[in-house]
Amino acid sequence: MDMDNQNTKIYTDKFLAVTSLLFVFISVAGLAIYSQESIKIAATWMQWTTSVFTTPVLLFAFLAIIFTFGLAFSKYGKIKLGEGKPQYSTMSWIFMFILSGIGSSTLYWGFLDWAYYYQTPGLSLPPESAEALKYSVAYSFFHSGLSAWAIYALASISLCYSYHVRKNKGLSLASVIEAVTGFKSTGVVGRLVDLMFLLCMFGALTISLVLTAVTFTNILSQLTGIPNTFMTKVIIILAVSVLFALSSYVGMDKGMQRLSHMVCLGVVLFAIYVLCFGPTQFILNNSLMSFVLMATNFVDMSLFTDPMGDGKFTREWTVFYWLWWISYAPGVALFVTRVSKGRTIKEVIFAMVIGGSVGLWFIFGVFENYSVYSFIHGAVNVPQILSQQGGEVAIGQLLSLLPAGKLMMWIFLGIMVVFLAAHMDAVGYAVSATCTRGLSEGQDPSPNARLFWCVMLTLVPIAMIFSKAPLDTMKTATIVTALPFIVIILIQTYGLVKWLIQDYAKVPSHLIEQQGYDDQEIGLNQTQDEHAKRMQLELASSIKLDRKTS
């Protein structure tokens, strides 16, 4: 770390922290007091947002795949993000950023997503038909696959490059915007950007936490007969929060890294159990068919606007999902940046887009196809239960059908708790880093700051449950905030392209691959003009050396 980094003052942006908390709790109070009005307003917002921005959102997600893979396969994909060896093993690294990008509600959707597509299918298929059932898991693969993770990768790479290569200070969204545009991170624009990010993180995590708490308490009630009450949900949330707070307080290496291993290995082993002791042949066959259907119809699924129809499926599912992933992207980018020092751009892109997609395809393929099989053979009418009683009831019934069903339900609940704690840890880190100014490479927010945000992130969902504020309204608000993030990610991407051209356009591919440029020695901490001059001198020297040895 250079002397400039060491002398940089690190402090908490109290104005940003207080303002964001005021906005969050006022919003919760408003949702509780004006619940009916907020539901109507939210429905109008959602309808307008998904209708007007259908084509831009679809194109954004589709082009994100093209750009990220193009970057990975180009010479720029060989650029190393920071000096030295990677801080974490490849497995730990992948586990951690996967958990930063998906919440514990993934376990909920893993059993039920297909049922929604069966009832309201895409590609103009008849509802609840054989064709709709055939494409149901394929659409689930599509919405959790390449496009989604490419959005995460697109947001992450520019921040990684700014922080680890350009050595720009501050691990926040506003910091990279400052590096690209010149707008100060502590100015009006910078604080507005970070405020939107914080509100979005609170909203997204609250939705995931409340949904998990509802699912957990319902299954717990089926197992033990404990009443599914407000206090039961609060106890569950507090238990998760204690685990989350301990993990966050002890730091990334002792906390998040261990939790991520526990969760990912636990989920994989649970899925293997379902695969082996469930309808193995059906799960394998339908997973393969669903993957092929997704692959062969990928462009149609990506750009299906349904201009001759009402476009309802595209608006309510594909556009909704892409906006949901976009709303999470800045937070994921902050966390990925923190754990990716020493990796190359290509490694980050492939690990996120391929690793994240394959991981979710495996989990969704096993859980959803077990659910589909149970529906086809009349064991559990998942679509009907989903519509009439709620998804958490359907999950409980599905788990109870497994061999050693009650034991599997307990294990599922345990995985869900640790999953949620790990995800909250990642979000808590991103939030505390955003409110901590002056962070340089290798520095983290203080343990006390992380602990404070643990408490705040816990209070909001409890307040939502207690006040009976409509969760769908907060979901809509979170989705709507994704629109500005599209612009912000595009600005970040513009900055990334500009930096890559300035820094490496004239550098041969083999020199990048050999890591012939020591980032500190060539002056990446200097001005851009000085940096460009040093790069030219280094390039000229390497050419002379090649001539002498040839």
Give a label for each model feature.
Residues D2-I10, Y34-T49, T68-Q87, S136-H143, ...:
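Membrane-water interface regions at transmembrane-helix termini and the short interhelical loops
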Residues W109-L123, Y161-Y163, K167, V274-N297, ...:
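Extracellular/periplasmic helix-exit of transmembrane alpha-helices
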Residues D2-T8, K40-M46, F73-M91, A115-A138, ...:
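Flexible loop linkers connecting adjacent transmembrane helices
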Residues V165-K169, F197-T217, P330-M352, K406-C435:
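Membrane-helix boundary/coupling elements in multi-pass transport proteins
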Residues T50-F53, F60, V193-M201, I207, ...:
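Membrane-interface loop-to-helix entry segments
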Residues N7-A32, I65-F67, I102-T106, H143-V214, ...:
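Helix-loop-helix module between adjacent transmembrane segments
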Residues K9-S27, G182-R191, N228-A245, Y249, ...:
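Loop-to-transmembrane helix boundary motifs in multi-pass membrane proteins
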Residues M1-A132, I272, C276, T493-L500, ...:
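N-terminal alpha-helical transmembrane segments of multi-pass membrane transport
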